[in-house]
Amino acid sequence: MLSRLSRRCYCTSSVHRPWLFLGLGNPGDKYKGTRHNIGFEMIDVFAESVGIQMNLVNFKAIMGQGFVADLPVILAKPQTYMNLSGESSGPLAAYYKLPLNRVLVVHDDMQLPCGVLRLQEKGGHGCHNGLKSVMNHFRGNREFARLRIGIGKPPGQMDPKAFLLQKFSMPARERMDKALAEGVDALKLVLAKDFGESWRLFNVEQKYKHLKQHTILSA
């Protein structure tokens, strides 16, 4: 059963400000397992791996609060539907008085091959309506991090909207499950290291992984 968010504010620590990891997706069983909901999946997998229960509800989001290696972390899955994600993320970040350099958004990305991840310090919305809403509620500010999860491009002339709301094929699901495990490592890296060489090396490894997979499939 979900409980209300406690008034406890992790921002009282003068040593560590909390990180907010925000996964984008659509609420309801209808959308579970679809490409557009991989942000939700990443938050759930990470929460389970670090022992944070997603049993809080506030700011139009299902949430969890806890610590990872003594670092405060807030996890959230907006329940507003994708295109209105900012209605949750904006008030949530404001409540905790979080600077945007302590916010990371996890989202699907059609510009990356299926199962390939990329950490990004900041950037635009790339025509992703969920990101667009988040940015609008951050007053147009784009200075927040992202974990982009590649879902590949729709085949042929397939409508991108239909592609996003479709579930993964079995081979794609296997790649995505491996990617989610790697995503846990990526989020732990974010907590341990500021943007810099370690993030760049992670992205290089992800690019090499894709090239290696492509070579095997082409052989």
From Swiss-Prot:
Where is it chiefly localized?
Answer: mitochondrion
The record's catalysed reaction(s) read: an N-acyl-L-alpha-aminoacyl-tRNA + H2O = an N-acyl-L-amino acid + a tRNA + H(+)
**Could you give a single Gene Ontology term from the biological process aspect?**
RNA splicing
Transit peptide interval: 1-10
Claim: tRNA-binding is one of the keywords in the record = yes
**Gene3D superfamilies associated with the record:** Peptidyl-tRNA hydrolase (3.40.50.1470)
Kindly identify the residues recorded as the active site.
Answer: H36 (proton acceptor)
Q: What class of enzyme is it?
A: hydrolase
The record, for InterPro entries, names:
CRS2-like, Pept_tRNA_hydro, Pept_tRNA_hydro_CS, Pept_tRNA_hydro_sf
Site label Stabilizes the basic form of H active site to accept a proton, positions: D108
Q: What EC number(s) does its UniProt record assign? A: 3.1.1.29
Write down the Pfam families for this protein, in alphabetical order. Answer: Pept_tRNA_hydro (PF01195)
Keyword match Ribonucleoprotein? yes
Query: Record's PANTHER family?
Result: PEPTIDYL-TRNA HYDROLASE, PEPTIDYL-TRNA HYDROLASE, MITOCHONDRIAL
HAMAP family in the cross-refs: Pept_tRNA_hydro_bact
Report what the protein is called.
Peptidyl-tRNA hydrolase, mitochondrial
